[in-house]
UniProtKB/Swiss-Prot annotation:
Pfam families: QRPTase_C (PF01729), QRPTase_N (PF02749). It is an enzyme of class 2 (transferase). Substrate binds at residues 107, 142-144, 166, 176, 206, 227, 256-258. Keywords: Cytoplasm, Glycosyltransferase, Nucleus, Pyridine nucleotide biosynthesis, Transferase. It comes from Saccharomyces cerevisiae (strain ATCC 204508 / S288c) (Baker's yeast). Present with 2660 molecules/cell in log phase SD medium. This is Nicotinate-nucleotide pyrophosphorylase [carboxylating]. Hexamer formed by 3 homodimers. SUPFAM superfamilies: Nicotinate/Quinolinate PRTase C-terminal domain-like (SSF51690), Nicotinate/Quinolinate PRTase N-terminal domain-like (SSF54675). It catalyses: nicotinate beta-D-ribonucleotide + CO2 + diphosphate = quinolinate + 5-phospho-alpha-D-ribose 1-diphosphate + 2 H(+). The gene is BNA6. One of its GO terms (cellular component) is nucleus. Involved in the catabolism of quinolinic acid (QA). GO terms for molecular function: nicotinate-nucleotide diphosphorylase (carboxylating) activity. Pathway: Cofactor biosynthesis; NAD(+) biosynthesis; nicotinate D-ribonucleotide from quinolinate: step 1/1.
Length: 295
């Protein structure tokens, strides 16, 4: 099983993210901590809903910053099935430390695991569906992430088996309708972008027709996004473009716009290299976790 924690640098800003999340939860006095004090306690962290466990390194950092000892019983990316237990829950981790520290860490850690596991689970479901049809290309998320949570959400897509797509505006140039309208044409937009991004950064162009896609390919775009095409129209356009430019131009075709678990199969074809969807991370249901002190 891949060790996704290795993606997170030792001195990375993700640790500061955790500090900020804890500070957001207790910006001044911890009144609840005063009530319970610092007696040594043990607690169980439960998962109460079937799904893929994700967010463990981030939750571990919460516990580390709260000076707690944790024993994880499952690895990142494990698929948990508490529904098979009579109790309807499963112990994911055991936590030891001062009572006030455990309760300080509780909600932040649970929120991280719930959100991250929800995204990983949705990603796992949609990539599994695609693979079950024989499709071997890429299923990706989008940049429509929650402000302040992009690192966590993109990480969760990877754990679930999907591609993150571009991480930010600096990772890849994506020229959409507004860029094209502002510059006058797809050709102008691609030319202007290439002048500053150089050879190392890819350029993607959002296209609404085969003619626009052809212009983008001729202009030197690396990725052609066929946006909001319908199933049969998408497949015909993709096949036409691949046949026309075979051996002449190298580019990738991406399909985007309204894709989700319910309709993806209608759009899948081998001529499309990438399918991108925000459904795996935007408005995604969370996975239910809880934490209880031993008593």
């Amino acid at each position: 099983m891949p060790v996704y924690e290795h993606l997170l640098p030792v001195n990375g800003a993700w640790r500061q993210d955790v500090t900020n999340w804890l500070s957001e939860d207790v910006p001044s006095f911890d009144f609840g901590g005063y009530v319970v004090g610092s007696d040594l306690k043990e607690a169980n962290l439960y998962c109460k809903q079937d799904g893929m466990l994700c967010g463990v390194p981030f939750a571990q950092e919460v516990f580390n910053q709260c000076e707690l000892q944790v024993e994880w019983l499952f690895k990142e990316g494990s698929f948990l099935e508490p529904s098979k237990n009579d109790s309807g829950k499963i112990v994911v981790a055991k936590i030891t430390g001062p009572a006030k520290n455990i309760l300080l860490a509780e909600r932040t850690a649970l929120n991280i695991l719930s959100r991250s596991s929800g995204i990983a689970t949705a990603s796992h479901k949609i990539i599994s569906l695609a693979r079950s049809t024989g499709y071997k290309g890429t299923i990706a998320g989008t940049r429509k992430t929650t402000p302040g949570l992009r690192r966590l959400e993109k990480y969760s897509m990877l754990v679930g088996g999907c591609d993150t797509h571009r991480y930010d505006l600096s990772s890849m140039v994506m020229l959409k309708d507004n860029h094209i309208w502002a510059t006058g044409s797809i050709t102008n937009a691609v030319k202007n972008a290439r002048a500053v991004c150089g050879f190392a950064v890819k350029i993607e162009v959002e296209c609404l027709s085969e003619d626009e896609a052809t212009e983008a390919i001729e202009a030197g775009a690396d990725v052609i996004m066929l946006d909001n095409f319908k199933g049969d129209g998408l497949k015909m356009c993709a096949q036409s473009l691949k046949n026309k430019w075979n051996g002449k131009k190298h580019f990738l075709l991406e399909c985007s716009g309204g894709l989700n678990l319910d309709n993806l199969e209608e759009y899948l074809c081998d001529d499309i290299d990438i399918y991108s969807t925000s459904s795996i991370h935007q408005g995604t249901p969370v996975i239910d976790f809880s934490l209880k002190l031993a008593h």
